[in-house]
UniProtKB/Swiss-Prot annotation:
Record's subcellular location: Endoplasmic reticulum membrane
Reactions it catalyzes: a 1-acyl-sn-glycero-3-phosphocholine + H2O = sn-glycerol 3-phosphocholine + a fatty acid + H(+)
Organism of derivation: Aspergillus clavatus (strain ATCC 1007 / CBS 513.65 / DSM 816 / NCTC 3887 / NRRL 1 / QM 1276 / 107)
A GO cellular component annotation in the UniProt record: endoplasmic reticulum membrane
Top-level EC class as recorded in UniProt: hydrolase
Official protein name in the record: Lysophospholipase nte1
Biased composition (Polar residues): 761-775
Regulation: Inhibited by organophosphorus esters.
Biased composition (Basic residues): 370-388
Stretches in topological domain Lumenal: 94-115
Motif GXSXG: positions: 1256-1260
SMART domains documented for this protein: cNMP
Enzyme Commission numbers on file: 3.1.1.5
Amino acid sequence: MADGNLLGSSTSLTALLPTPSSASLSASLSSSSLPVSPFLAPAPTTAITASIASLSAQPPPPLPATPATMAGWIGWVFSFFFQFIPSVLYSVITFTTITLPTWLFTLFSMSLTFTMNFTTLLLILLAVVSTLGWFVRYRFLNMYSRLPPEPQRKEPQIDLFPDVQGGDSKPGLANYLDEFLSAIKVFGYLERPVFHELTRTMQTRKLIAGETLMLEEEKGFCLVVDGLVQIFVKSTRDGKSGSDDELHHLGAESSDEEHHIDGKQGYQLLTEVKNGASMSSLFSILSLFTEDIQVWDSQSSTSSSSSIAMRAARVPDSTPNSPRGGMDSPTPIFRDVPDPVSLVNENGDLPLVPPLHLEESPIPPTNHAHDRRQHDHRKHHGRKHRKSVHPDIVARAMVDTTIAIIPASAFRRLTRVYPRATAHIVQVILTRLQRVTFATAHSYLGLSNEVLGIEKQMTKFTTYDLPNNMRGTALDRLKDKFIKERDRLGTEEVTKGIALHNPSAGRRRRSSSFMRKDAVLHAKMMSPKRAATVITSDNSYDHDSAGVSPGDLLSTIQQSRFGPRYEQPTPRLRSPLAEKENSHFRLPAMQARNAFHRKESLDEDALFRECILDCIMKAIGLTSSTGEVLRKSSHSGEASPKLLSYDSRRQKAVFSNNAFGFIDPYEGSGDGETESMMSMSVTSAGGTSPVTSLREELRNDIEIVYFPQGSVLVEQGERHPGLYYVIDGFLDVGMPVVDKGEDLVGVSKPATAREPFPTLKRTTTASSIKPSATAANDPRRRKQSRKSLYLIKPGGIQGYVGAVASYRSYTDVVAKTDVYVGFLPRASLERIAERYPIALLTLAKRLTSLLPRLLLHIDFALEWVQVNAGQVIYHQGDESDAIYLVLNGRLRSVLESADNKLTVIGEYGQGESVGELEVMTESTRPATLHAIRDTELAKFPRSLFNSLAQEHPGITIQVSKLIAQRMRDLVERPVTEKGAERSSAGGVQTATSTLNLRTVGILPVTAGVPVVEFGNRLLHALHQIGVVNGVTSLNQSAILNHLGRHAFSKMGKLKLAQYLADLEEKYGMVLYIADTNVNSPWTQTCITQADCILLVGLAESSPSIGEYERFLLGMKTTARKELVLLHSERYCPPGLTRRWLKNRVWINGGHHHIQMAFRLTAEPSHPETKRFGTVLKQRVQVLQAEIQKYTSRRIRQTPLYSAQTPFKGDFHRLARRLCGRAVGLVLGGGGARGIAHVGVIKALEEAGIPVDIIGGTSIGSFIGALYARDADVVPMYGRAKKFAGRMGSMWRFALDLTYPTISYTTGHEFNRGIFKTFGDSQIEDFWLEFYCNTTNISKSRQEYHSSGYVWRYVRASMSLAGLIPPICDEGSMLLDGGYIDNLTVDHMKGLGADVIFAVDVGSIDDNTPQGYGDSLSGFWVAFNRWNPFSSCPNPPTLSEIQARLAYVSSIDNLERAKITPGCLYMRPPIDAYGTLEFGKFDEIYQVGYKFGKQFLEKLKNEGSLPLPEETEEEKKLLRTMAPRRASI
């Protein structure tokens, strides 16, 4: 009560008194209570303390009311500071100095006593320990379960942009110009004056529905502007055509579906021509351009009668356009006086026209009536056989149709006025003829005999023997030189041939710019003298030409920028007869005599080279053909000199182009630098030029090479290295023969480097194990796998068609005997073709005269189609009307499901075909086909297929083989299975997406990325890997240097497209490097031309979207896109890649980690270096290196990886991925037996075999992830051994046991072991591409994981049912992937791996036959196990039966993997070790290492080890471009 009164009094006092007095009172009360008894003290102390606390906790005393005046404000502030703040300070001091010590004294003076028994104490101790254990277990040791969620990256959605193209038919004539331009795109790039010249005489014609047009009677280029026309061909069943003698080429002649046209039977439908398509074929265009070109040189006679007989064997009558004017009975030609009239009219002259008509040439005046009669006869005979460029072809309009016709006269005039442009067009058409018609017939339809027969018949035009005095003793002396050198070198050193030493080789060619300037200077200095020479009398001309050899002739030609230097000067004011008498085009023997007389002081080697060059030049048409065209031009000039002069001035002002001398003789030669790209000019005769002539230049290029018997000069599929002129010996031209077993799938198999180009698939993933280059050169093997076609005898030329027209060889050429050849490189031939269009025109004329009827009709029906990027070629469900062959570009086939989900079925690159199955079965299109980029296609219409099937069943069989192979692939791996597999795997690669990539665009993410250096290093790596047909890179400067300032203008767009298409056809791969700013046309070109786009970014920079990526998205390209991250060190921080990929859903081709040393800013130590000297710089660098050695957490690479194995570099890995030649490593599961994987990988490292992709199952996924993380065997070994030690601990296993509801263990220790190994790393951060597989028991399917946390999916792949619980992933339960597929070779093949090393360490089941009867007693089984005398095998236990049942599907996949092409199956001898014997790490590791060494050594001895060095040797196709020189 007293306490209560005291408390109440204190409270009342507090309310009445000021703060200090109340505080003193409470202090006195508390001090007076100290001597109280200890038993009574706590109560009053507590009460007083409460009062003190209440006093201190109470708010300060109420302040006076807020004053209204300034003095009141000041007083209020003073009262606040002097009352409130001191009271708070006093309360704090009192609590810390009095109250708190009192509490502590009371607490420590208190004594407590607890009494309990041992059981209670033990229970409390267990509770405390369990609580601490739970806290540590679930708070500290369970960090792996608290990682932030990182779901797998989903497959990007396929971009299929709406088709903006209008389709085939456009209404009316509104788009007349568009249709016309699309039709004449076949001519390639046309400059404006050429276009006007070609189209100014164009005519249009209206055809009503059902009207028939006899194309046989149409001499011109026909195209459909509006409407629909059907093209028919006369069936060979009639056999009455004048050009139907080649029935042996055409097979069966029966025709069930024939059409009636004008009451006649025997016509078959070839194709239907729609808007903007040509009714003429490539062959007919060549015929129009080359009407005035001679097929062979009628003046040239060789010293060999056999050659004369060979040339007398004329073109067979079956050829549609065989020029036969007076050639059935060749008459001897006098050496001294060649007949110019026969030269002019041998192919039939043009019809007689008035003299002033510019488009036709009149008959040249002649004084010999016999010549005139002979001319008339030949003219009539030639006209009869040249009446049509469309033999046996009839067109019928299905609807009212408008067609446009460019008459033949326009082409003849174009050839005269613009010969350079004509040669350019002919070059384009020759290229397309090879890529469209020849490649389709040879590689797709199997018409090898027809195609190769053209090259065989071409030898009759190109055989010219050496003069007699260069044979016999001179040839023997030449052979002796080579024999001595061969004996000195040995047989092994001469497989590539021995080249005769050329003393002039060192001074071969000056730079082109120097020669241009020299030529221009000389032209200006010599122009008055040239003019005087032109108008001199015949005597002076005779004097100048007396004793002139062809070499002297060449020296008289001006060498302008693109000028000719091997064409006859054109004396304008001379009669044809006088010109005939003073012709410079002598016969070979006289040429040789003059040459020898002029070169008496030189040795025989130079004479050999000169004679070989003479023969080669005559063979390619640089002889009388040139003179004949010059004479025709002079005739035209004589008939209308003023008009010709005016016309030449007009064309010089607009489009200067003169190859054959169509220029006014008084016109001075302009500056070579100012001429057009197509321009040329010719000087007149008179004097010799000091400028180095083409002849002198080429004579230094001629190599005389010796090849021993069996040497390979040209391989099939190789671009011709040049011309081989056979001096002595025989060359065998043949082709490889596919084995019987491979014949069924030979068409659809990807081609190797030795297969023809282009084939259906040039880049391979199935031809991994190929014999080495030495095996390929084995004569015994060659005899077994090679079919000989024909021989090339001395005097013959090999590679004429291929080298001049830049074709690829359909055959291989082998030395039948020891052979001596003259070799002219392809580069020299290209210079000839550039300066002398007559060479190309002669080749075109010869080709058209030899084309078989079957190829002619195929050429008519094949349509060359140009498709823009993103354009849909056909939609799913459309009627199938054609087969499409990819000439250039890339297509993608997309399947659209009912829920509008798009699935990629396949991608088709250059040389591949699509649509055969639907055409043959006449079904609808199963999927939508669209162009990934700008694409050129050959459209093979169904009507042509039906027509060929009736007359040539072999073609049907060939296509049926292809369809059978594709159906087999479809059965073995259905489309739906692939789609489900990819969607569940999280990966985005498809089986076809990495195949046959021809163009790669290199695009920076943002400005500042060193893409040029990256591109150069990638180019170097591709060169070292050995890409088929080579690789090149393009940047803006390279394009500008080649095409000039109009490269990116509207005018040059077609020119650029054609140039890029030619490059892509010439090289196996083209790199487009976007080294310009974002909005430049070159960046746009790089994007639109790329099959695959590499987005290059700096890993350490910001992962935000860059400006180049925004531009890329705006382009709406559907090309494959891959991300390349450049690292300065060989280390990727965890989570870095995920940040880059998170916002880039358009990356649909994976990513790559590349180490590349780069520096965007200058080193900070450079300024100090200048001020403090080199000593300080060295000290700083040493200290920095030492500090980084101990402080950096990044794993340093040992020299084992980088220095000794250069092919394992990052750029080489990227190069192999792009080429489709990646090396995959598949590691199977098997528990502790998987430790052998470590030894096998070490053996692969020591053998120098690079690994690009790693896939694993169970323990294989663990070992594979360790290797993929760092791409080094050293850290992999240490971490694997540490993990094996944890797994071998029985204490950890025992502590992890739990009640076996789902599994025997909780899985915690297992999780921690894996997590301690990998940490929070993600699969995307691995240096090598990695995946692992699991079994999803929730959805009953297999899944592949290539993104997300490593430890989770490796743990899931290692989860053995019953021992470890399944891991949960997005609601599904994942178990060991080995239950479905323990060796994932099939998926690795789908990722683009060419060679796969598959290591199987799984257990082998006991397959002992059982015979325990129809019922079984468990007691008997138990007794039988312990009975040592029992002869009955022990039946499997219940757990064994369940385990075998779980692995049923895995066994089937394992057997399929063993026979997969390109798979090297390895099984180390580890059957003696159990699944959980992790304690035997060193022992199992040594077993795997020794087995790997022995296995790889065996492969190396067999020649089937895919070492980079051997692969490089296989690609060295140019046998003579770098021959071994011998100074003989």
